[in-house]
Amino acid sequence: MAAEVVFKGTAFPESLRWHNGDLWFSDVLAGVVYRGDVTTGQLHIEAEIAPYVSGLGWLSSGELLIVDCEKRAVVQLGSDGKLSMHADLKSHWSFNANDMHVDVDNTVWIGTYGYNPESDSPVPADLARISNGNIDFPISGLVFANGIARIDAQKIVVAETFADRISVIQTSGEVKLLKQIHLPNNSTPDGLVVDNQGFAWVALAYAEAILRVNLETGEMVRAIEIPGRGVYDCTFGGPNLDKLYVATSDTDETHVMRDLPGEILCFDLGLTHPGVRGLGNK
């Protein structure tokens, strides 16, 4: 499938969000949050959080929430450009905070590394919920919880990168794990998004593809191949939410700050998957 390169010259783009006609994302290792105009290719710096930044989401009042990975916190970007604390998770977690999802009622769901993936064996950890100023941990046992997307009003799906699986979680009423869908070995699922037909589009970080997964049956197909690239996130965008934007970079993170190989690609699904659109709920 042919792709258009819409943005280039970043280090490690992730946390893609389509918001108010622009594509927002985090350049994780550069500690920068960008807003991108997909028409002109212009990137605008909206926030800088050293050394690492991850998940993005908006409150109903319009303020942007950002994950400060190393401080293990969610911070809020004010209209004056200043950052303030929204939720501090440092006393709860020993390792970096990761991606998150913000619901329409301002509830935040956020994961943590849970261990050092460069030196340690995988260790399960909790998924945090932040609601009305309160922090709790209703789900445990997730291995490197990463991308989070809402399926519907009752459920979210979470990528567990180093367990090679995605987990469907009930969020209404009693929060509980509903199912785990195991992906092929070494899939390393990272960011994900859900379409209007009940499928998750999952970025496979080190497997060079986007996997489309039926969340009811577990059936899956490699929908998009991106040879030679790390594939770190995807989201729907465009006026009709029928374009898939994909964050890619080099898989060797040791030189991405020097070489800036990060690119965001756009795939027109109207040509290959007619009728498939995003839900606008990432």
Each model region followed by its residue ranges:
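A short helix->beta-strand "capping" segment at the edge of beta-propeller domains
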Residues: 1-9, 38, 269-270, 277-282
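A short beta-strand motif characteristic of beta-propeller blades
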Residues: 2-7, 41-48, 83-90, 134-140, ...
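A short loop-to-beta-strand structural motif that recurs across blades of beta-propeller domains
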Residues: 32-34, 73-75, 125-128, 165-167, ...
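Residue-level marker for isolated small/hydroxyl-bearing positions within beta-strands
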Residues: 26, 67, 111, 159, ...
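Short loop/turn segments that connect beta-strands within beta-propeller blades
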Residues: 37-41, 78-82, 130-134, 170-174, ...
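Beta-rich, blade/repeat-based domains predominating
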Residues: 7-21, 49-68, 91-114, 124-126, ...
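Short, solvent-exposed loop/turn segments at conserved positions within beta-propeller repeat blades
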Residues: 28-29, 69-70, 117-125, 161-163, ...
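Blade-level signature of beta-propeller repeat domains, shared across WD40, Kelch, NHL, RCC1
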Residues: 235-282
